[in-house]
């Protein structure tokens, strides 16, 4: 199911001409040609058409124009009925300018909703109706129960529940204020400014309150009422009654954006308030009548689509209507027959022969040796060969999969043979109804991904490539007299008890497990110590075979160390049903673990549905909405490792997205941004469909965002393709002319920011918009903030739109920096990182937040003249900061620069962020330093003449040292520099304590297909920089050495910067 074929207004045409001839077919058989404006609405076109039709024969056969709608063929080759007649001709995405007039039939509302959903996800919903796979149809029906449940939850307490869905509280996970933030308060109190609109002309009045930081919003409102009524000279009893009467009628809103304090959290737990305390700013809140918020909330009505009433297309055995037998009663080894291949595209002169390589895998681990077919000539790839595997059918685990690839062999006699995969595919050995696959099957294979080093791709997607013009392999599984099912839990438990008692030499009894457990509790102290040591190792450290045996023999004691579960699962022999059955019994009653630990069980190493189900239950129990938002990128990625469409993780994420609109917003965009990827377009498309069906009126907001993004993609495509040779002036003229057109003005104004749905983008400030100079022609866009109190937050919103750069790596790096910042803040380290907003919204398309009042180091150096620009004057940066921060605020600016520089030194070192130069390090006017453009990480650095260009572990040039030491001659001998080093050491050790979390977050991203994150070897770079094989003392010494290299090797960075500056000047 590919995404949309083009971003143009007609097939193969970016922009329609201003006037266009449209062929209109009327119900009386007449064809009328109309000249229409490209921006004309359908209602205008219809009116003109019926006026014109009176001049043609048979016009008396036509009914009134309101009885008809238009229908046409779109660029997806789909027939679409246009019910919304306010749509413009240029926005219909027609294949050709043909319109047919028809009388509408069928359920109008459902058709309109289906069109809106199709537009949002980028493919027509009817494509799902045509899929014959029963798993797809059952998923679509069954997932509606989650949708219904979520909608019912939103309506539970009427308006308040609905408000909580639309405006979920934006709070920190914990109410605890870190000590260094608490110390910024005045004896635990905070000054808050409360604003009230006092007239229809929006006249404002403000009240300044000093309140305890842990007050709940209702107490703040009560205090505001007391202050407001002070002039009324009420008695204490009257005041009490007044407060009681009005306190519950108001709510607090953040001035300048759509954020509300709707729940009884301590004030300082709200993120807005906490950031104000940290930055030393006074929070501005607006007092608003609860009723006015409730009255503008949309009423959600969720209607079951017509397909929910269709009967399942699953075969009778799937519905339990035919005789079945347990997998465990079969007494034969697994075998598979490879029949033949078609569409194998190879160069016969280069390739001698081809063969099929196969393996049975559980996650990335083989369950037995791989087996190859005979080699055959490429011209006629037929095998008809049974392959026998060294594994009994009863020993197949639930998540077993067959992995295969067609491979070529190259090499003459005596020379070393070269084996190369041509195409790969994977098949689940059990379908979604627990049934063992049987009979013949044709599998369309996938192209080999960049960076695949092995012949098989066991962690790749299962199932057939929807593109039928790819290599196709025909194969056959054994047939059995009855349908073969994986045993249920009661049979598994019985077998586990039997195998434990056999192992322990007890008689077969249900008391077997508990007796075994009692013996396990009498472990020697050094065994317990060894278990604890294994438990604390990072997820990438190898577990030896001896350690696996040791873990397994003490598996019952392991229950007392719940977080050891991932290591224990890796020690299970998944090709032994005895061990798997016992592990299932342990997992069933395993104590819950922290969400950060549970997430490890969702990566590609843990495919078993029981294990993944346990992980999801831990997330349901302990993962706050704030933490879920923080880890959402990874949780969406690991959906790719789920065996089937319907699973507990999908249900958990969908329910969260449908009960918290902020989570839903990013859930939508993370899924939508991968719809071009054929390996996941069906899975993600189905999930998007179910989200869009139940997200209520937010679908209209999402479609406004999608429409705006489509317009910007079209514009930038023209700039890169048709206007690439024009001057900047000509390109800018074209941009402004296009943006002034009515359809562009409609689409690009008055919608919610995809970067942050609490921010509204009002009117475009065209005079402030520009095309940036880099190769992909990004757009710098500027919108007004339409909020009534915008001057108290920001009056305009600047965003960079990029078309042509993959922003997923930037998005991941910024997320990791944000998590590092949280860890540091919670440990009392205020390193003032600036992880600005960044969102990938499609294939190499995305948005980046512009940080206000910031400049690149190069811009600052260029202000210092040629000498500064060419880096020979290291004092330029310090002088610039001094000029910007005169008097008392100078010390604060240097302190801010020092803290942020320390944070970014540590972060860029740990993450191996490359390509650092003076155009991607920025400084704000107040001294805060931050990095941008994270195109290279995990030590994949840019190369020049075959060598890695950067030769120091992180950037710490003389320019920075001079600022940190306040301009001292010998920078590294100052107290300020010592303090800076101390900050770096503390920051490094703090992240090292959380190494497992960062390794897990990167491991969960392995399925993303990012070029620099392909395997566990890439992630091993973090093990190296955090020195996880060393003691804490040794790790600190290692980091100190790296830091020493950085400031002594500063001249090499300087040379890189000089070359970069010269190159940029040449480009400009």
Curated annotation (Swiss-Prot):
Protein name (database record): Phosphatidylinositol 4,5-bisphosphate 3-kinase catalytic subunit alpha isoform
Pathway: Phospholipid metabolism; phosphatidylinositol phosphate biosynthesis
SMART domains attached to this UniProt entry: PI3K_C2 (SM00142), PI3K_p85B (SM00143), PI3K_rbd (SM00144), PI3Ka (SM00145), PI3Kc (SM00146)
Gene: PIK3CA
Region of interest (G-loop), ranges: 771-777
Catalytic activity reported: L-seryl-[protein] + ATP = O-phospho-L-seryl-[protein] + ADP + H(+); a 1,2-diacyl-sn-glycero-3-phospho-(1D-myo-inositol) + ATP = a 1,2-diacyl-sn-glycero-3-phospho-(1D-myo-inositol-3-phosphate) + ADP + H(+); a 1,2-diacyl-sn-glycero-3-phospho-(1D-myo-inositol-4,5-bisphosphate) + ATP = a 1,2-diacyl-sn-glycero-3-phospho-(1D-myo-inositol-3,4,5-trisphosphate) + ADP + H(+); 1,2-dioctanoyl-sn-glycero-3-phospho-(1D-myo-inositol-4,5-bisphosphate) + ATP = 1,2-dioctanoyl-sn-glycero-3-phospho-(1D-myo-inositol-3,4,5-trisphosphate) + ADP + H(+)
Subunit composition and interactions: Heterodimer of a catalytic subunit PIK3CA and a p85 regulatory subunit (PIK3R1, PIK3R2 or PIK3R3). Interacts with IRS1 in nuclear extracts. Interacts with RUFY3. Interacts with RASD2. Interacts with APPL1. Interacts with HRAS and KRAS. Interaction with HRAS/KRAS is required for PI3K pathway signaling and cell proliferation stimulated by EGF and FGF2. Interacts with FAM83B; activates the PI3K/AKT signaling cascade.
Upper classification of the organism: Eukaryota, Metazoa, Chordata, Craniata, Vertebrata
Pfam families: PI3_PI4_kinase (PF00454), PI3K_C2 (PF00792), PI3K_p85B (PF02192), PI3K_rbd (PF00794), PI3Ka (PF00613)
Biological source species: Bos taurus
Keyword Nucleotide-binding: yes
GO cellular component annotations of the record: cytoplasm; intercalated disc; lamellipodium; perinuclear region of cytoplasm; phosphatidylinositol 3-kinase complex; phosphatidylinositol 3-kinase complex, class IA; phosphatidylinositol 3-kinase complex, class IB; plasma membrane
């Amino acid at each position: 199911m590919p995404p949309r074929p083009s971003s143009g207004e007609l097939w193969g045409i970016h922009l329609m001409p201003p006037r266009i001839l449209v062929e209109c077919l009327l119900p009386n058989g007449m064809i009328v040609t109309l000249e229409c404006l490209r921006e004309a609405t359908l209602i205008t076109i219809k009116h003109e058409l019926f006026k014109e039709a009176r001049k043609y024969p048979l016009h008396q056969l036509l009914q009134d124009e309101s009885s008809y709608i238009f229908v046409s063929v779109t660029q997806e080759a789909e027939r679409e009925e246009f019910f919304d007649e306010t749509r413009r001709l240029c926005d219909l995405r027609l294949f050709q300018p043909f319109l047919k007039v028809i009388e509408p039939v069928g359920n109008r509302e459902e058709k309109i909703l289906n069109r809106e959903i199709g537009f949002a996800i980028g493919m027509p919903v009817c494509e799902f109706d045509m899929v014959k796979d029963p798993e797809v149809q059952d998923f679509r029906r069954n997932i509606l129960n989650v949708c219904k449940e979520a909608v019912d939850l939103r309506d539970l307490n009427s308006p308040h529940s609905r408000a909580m869905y639309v405006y979920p509280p934006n709070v920190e996970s914990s109410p605890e204020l870190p000590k260094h933030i608490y110390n910024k308060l005045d004896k635990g109190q905070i000054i808050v400014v409360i604003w009230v609109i006092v007239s229809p002309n929006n006249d404002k009045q403000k009240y300044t309150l000093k309140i305890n930081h842990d007050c709940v919003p209702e107490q703040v409102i009560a205090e505001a009422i007391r202050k407001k009524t002070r002039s009324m000279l009420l008695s204490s009893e009257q005041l009490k009654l007044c407060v009681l009467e009005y306190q519950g009628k108001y709510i607090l809103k953040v001035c300048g954006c759509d954020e509300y304090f709707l729940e009884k959290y301590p004030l300082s737990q709200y993120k807005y308030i906490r950031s104000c305390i940290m930055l030393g700013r006074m929070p501005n809140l607006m007092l608003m009548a609860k009723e006015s918020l409730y009255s503008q909330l949309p009423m959600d009505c969720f209607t079951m689509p017509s397909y929910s009433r269709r009967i399942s297309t699953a075969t009778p055995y799937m519905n339990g209507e035919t005789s079945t037998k347990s997998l465990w009663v079969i007494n034969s080894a697994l075998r598979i027959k490879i029949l033949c291949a078609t569409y194998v595209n190879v160069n016969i002169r280069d390739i001698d022969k081809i063969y099929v390589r196969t393996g049975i895998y559980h996650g990335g681990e083989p369950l037995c040796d791989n087996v190859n077919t005979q080699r055959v000539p490429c011209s006629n790839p037929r095998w008809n060969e049974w392959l026998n595997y060294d594994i009994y059918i009863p020993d197949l685990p639930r998540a077993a999969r067959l992995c295969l690839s067609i491979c070529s062999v190259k090499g003459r006699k005596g020379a070393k043979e070269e084996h190369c995969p041509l195409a790969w595919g994977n098949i689940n050995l059990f379908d979604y109804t627990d049934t063992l696959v049987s009979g013949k099957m044709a599998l369309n294979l996938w192209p080999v991904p960049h960076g695949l080093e092995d012949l098989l791709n066991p962690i790749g997607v299962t199932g057939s490539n929807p593109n039928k013009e790819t290599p196709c392999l025909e194969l056959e599984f054994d047939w059995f007299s009855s349908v073969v099912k994986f045993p249920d839990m009661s049979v598994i438990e019985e077998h586990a008890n039997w195998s434990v008692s056999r192992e322990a030499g007890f008689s077969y009894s249900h008391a077997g497990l508990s007796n075994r457990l009692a013996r396990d509790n009498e472990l020697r102290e050094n065994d317990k110590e060894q278990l604890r040591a294994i438990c604390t190792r990072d997820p990438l450290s190898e577990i030896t075979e001896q350690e696996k045996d040791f873990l397994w023999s003490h598996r019952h004691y392991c229950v007392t160390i719940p977080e050891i579960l991932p290591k224990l699962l890796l020690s299970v022999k998944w090709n032994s049903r005895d061990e798997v059955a016992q592990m299932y019994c342990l997992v069933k009653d395993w104590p819950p673990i922290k969400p950060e630990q549970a997430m490890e069980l969702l990566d590609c190493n843990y495919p078993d549905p029981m294990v993944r189900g346990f992980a999801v239950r831990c997330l349901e129990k302990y993962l706050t909405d704030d933490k879920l938002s923080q880890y959402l990128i990874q949780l969406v990625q690991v959906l790719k490792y789920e065996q089937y469409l319907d699973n507990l993780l999908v249900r958990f994420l969908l329910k969260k997205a449908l009960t918290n609109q902020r989570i839903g917003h990013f859930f939508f965009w993370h899924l939508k941004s991968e719809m071009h990827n054929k390996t996941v377009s069906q899975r993600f498309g189905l999930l998007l469909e179910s989200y869009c069906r139940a997200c209520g009126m937010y679908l209209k907001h999402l479609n406004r965002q999608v429409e705006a993004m489509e317009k910007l993609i079209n514009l930038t495509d023209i700039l890169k393709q048709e206007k690439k040779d024009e001057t900047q002036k000509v390109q800018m003229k074209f941009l402004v002319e296009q943006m002034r057109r009515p359809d562009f003005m409609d689409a690009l104004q008055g919608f919610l920011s995809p970067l942050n749905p609490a921010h509204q983008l009002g009117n475009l400030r065209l005079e402030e918009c520009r095309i940036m100079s880099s190769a992909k022609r990004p757009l710098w866009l500027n919108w007004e903030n339409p909020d009534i109190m915008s001057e108290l937050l920001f009056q305009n919103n600047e965003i960079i739109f990029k078309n042509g750069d993959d922003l997923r790596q930037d998005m991941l790096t910024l997320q990791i920096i944000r998590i590092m910042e949280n860890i540091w803040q919670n440990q009392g380290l205020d390193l003032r990182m600036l992880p600005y907003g960044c969102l990938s919204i499609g294939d190499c398309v995305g948005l980046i937040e512009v940080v206000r009042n910031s400049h690149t180091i190069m811009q600052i150096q260029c202000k210092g003249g040629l000498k500064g620009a060419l880096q020979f004057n290291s004092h330029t940066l310090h002088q610039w900061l001094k000029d910007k921060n005169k008097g008392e605020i100078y010390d604060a600016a240097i302190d801010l620069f020092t803290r942020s520089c320390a944070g970014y030194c540590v972060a860029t070192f740990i993450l191996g962020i490359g390509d650092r130069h003076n155009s991607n390090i920025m400084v704000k006017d107040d001294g805060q330093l931050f990095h941008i453009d994270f195109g290279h990480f995990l030590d994949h650095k840019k190369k020049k003449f075959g060598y890695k260009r950067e030769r120091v572990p992180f950037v710490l040039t003389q320019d920075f040292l001079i600022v940190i030491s306040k301009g001292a001659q010998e920078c590294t001998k100052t107290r300020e520099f010592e303090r800076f080093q101390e900050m770096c050491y503390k920051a490094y050790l703090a992240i090292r304590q959380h190494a497992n979390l960062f390794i897990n977050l990167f491991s969960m991203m392995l399925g993303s297909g990012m070029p620099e994150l392909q395997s566990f070897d890439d992630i091993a770079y973090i093990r190296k920089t955090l020195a996880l094989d060393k003691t804490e003392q040794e790790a600190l010494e290692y980091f100190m050495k790296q830091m020493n290299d950085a400031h002594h090797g500063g001249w090499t960075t300087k040379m890189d910067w000089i070359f970069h500056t010269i190159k940029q000047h040449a480009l400009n």
